Amino acid sequence: IRTPLDPDTTYSDDPLRMLRAIRFATKLSTPERPFRIVDESLASITRNLHRMQILSKERIAEELNKILVSSRPSIAFSLMDKTGMLEYVLPELAHLKGVETQEGRGHKENFSHTLMVLDNVCRLEEKAIAEGRLCNYDIVDNHEVITVRTEPNVWLRWAALLHDIGKPASKRYDPQIGWTFHSHEFIGGKMIYDSLKGDDDANVHLAD
């Protein structure tokens, strides 16, 4: 994947194109045939990350939603990490990176764990959809309406992506038992609620 014109000009004119390039690489990749962004374009993304400050949260969220309904969204978040974009788009996710060690005891690397969980959720959901085992439940005119679900649930995937973001704030080392992350789920829920103030739909699905 490359830009038709000079990448610095392309990305500076509309910085959302940087995130869109990552989305295209993710959506078009298969295990047998991965798509990649050419090195020149990747380097340009890193150089132009400061331009992302002009983007609205809504435009970024729209691209992230499209990434999350792909089969292997971990590709996108790995590319965001590689270019430095993750700190601009989802700093809470970037803070999961790394392993701290005390007395020779470390904890699991939570960033790679999160991406593995996300891809597994996507794989299992897509398998269940293909087999017709997922349904939508609605109330219409006081009647129950149940329909077979044919599309991915983006909120399920957001939950998988953000399920451990409370771990850095809750991390403690106990010489008796090792590393703990007590109440990380509640801390993470509050982080989501605080960052999504004003977006009632997202909070209903995620923070609650």
What is each stretch, according to the model?
Residues 1-157, 161, 165-183, 187-206:
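Glycine- and charge-enriched loop/helix tracts that form the active or gating conduit
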